[in-house]
Amino acid sequence: MDGYDGKFMIIDLDFINILPQALLNRGIFLSDKIGVYEIGWKFDDVIKVLYIIKEKEMTVLGGDVYELNGDEIIITYDSWSFSGSNFIKSFEKASKYINNYYKNNGDNFIYTIIVSNATK
């Protein structure tokens, strides 16, 4: 969807264009589970996704955390956001949030990422 200030938001299937198929296959498509058009990843994979986004010089606008309980996905209402266009600072904020969340809460969570790519 075209957004604001010449930016493009990447959600759900748009990740196909920037992520390796193996990483996409490990993602959890939330539209199937809870009707949210995002892909969630466990900790190790979401860190890989962040590095790919950084390499593409895309800005992480924020993300959400969901708890995994067997096949059930539970909304935690935990999230982070970033305002600005510095892709390095956005990467650092997302990485710090996710790493801290993982250290404090364990491995039964997935993380979604909302990304904006300023047109060049």
Predicted features by range, described:
Residues 13, 32, 62-67, 77-79, ...:
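Surface-exposed beta-strand edges and flanking loops
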Residues 1-40:
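Long, contiguous N-terminal structural blocks used for assembly/anchoring
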Residues 10, 14, 37-44, 48, ...:
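Alpha-helix boundary/N-cap detector
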Residues 98-120:
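Acidic, proline/glycine-rich low-complexity IDRs
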Residues 17-18, 35, 39-48, 52-63, ...:
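Conserved NAD+-utilizing ADP-ribose enzyme module
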Residues 51-106:
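Amphipathic protein-protein interaction modules
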